[in-house]
Amino acid sequence: MRTIEGENELLLTCMETPDGVSVLRCETRDDDVRLPDEIGGAPVVSLGGYALSERAPDLTGRDTFRVRVTCGGPEPVHDANAIRAVTLSKRLQSVGSYAFYNCRRLETLTFSGSLTEFGGDALMNCRALRHIRLHADPAAPTCLHRVLGEHAGELDVIFLHGGARIRLLFPAYSEELETLAPAHIFQRRIHGAGYGYRQCFESGVLHFRGYDLALESLLDRHDFSVAARVAVRRLAAPYQLADAARAAYLDCLRAHGGALARDCAAAGESAALSFLLSLGVLSREDIAAACDTAREKEQTAALSVLLAALGQNIPKGRAKSFDL
């Protein structure tokens, strides 16, 4: 068995392909898994079906070899539930069906623009997934639309390209099949604006104008909290943001930014509060309410930002009561 140094304890079952190496199985109990970019000088180009899943794939008859990736720890016994984050190989081209099946605690998936195929049900039962990190040009075709199509939950997506960070929110949606008796015809019903957001792609390229127009559907559904979070992300990194869309996002935050400010205050997100305040969309009442929340949650840094916006300072006596 080959052994290579890495950032994890992984036990890989691999197969050579014309383009490089395919990882058919990855056994680990690490929470942050980083697949190697190369094995034996050849690029890792595919991740097989069920590769990281709770269930092992049937590799009978395959011409495989094993690779131990180690950072000095013991040989791992696979635990799909331990996995919280996965970074795919830089030149990975395909992910097989059910690759992450029953990775129930998987929260973050990172991949590059080289990924072009994403198998059906690859994310089945990955209900904790919330973050996608994509190293790619947002103006180029990517596999993002396929990944989004495999997960109906809310996803926070970040494009990382040339030093830029373009952050987008794709809302959740749900669907159900309703039987129309007595003909036993099934009618598909979709609930939530997230499905519409997932249709904003043309030939694999995200259509930012279509994404921005989808804000109206969130407001029509009274999903004001989600709409505010969509708005603040687009305004923070206004890639291909038209003037009309910018105005719509600012109007959204004038109407619903107060609740977002309170959420940020409760979580101690000072940087987010500073940006929200810089937009000039919060009323003094909104800021005062966020101050009350920050005091209640003992978020001193957030309270400082908010009080500065009101032209006040934290009373020294109260500041001492916080756990800094």
Language-model features: locations:
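Ankyrin repeat arrays, specifically the small/polar loop and inter-repeat linker segments at the C-terminal end
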Residues: 242-256, 281-288, 301, 311-323
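Consensus positions within tandem repeat domains that build extended binding/scaffold surfaces
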Residues: 50, 96-98
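Ankyrin repeat structural motif
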Residues: 268-277, 299-308, 315
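Structural signature of tandem-repeat unit edges
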Residues: 2, 7-20, 27-45, 56-94, ...
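TPR/TPR-like alpha-solenoid helical repeat scaffolds
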Residues: 291-299
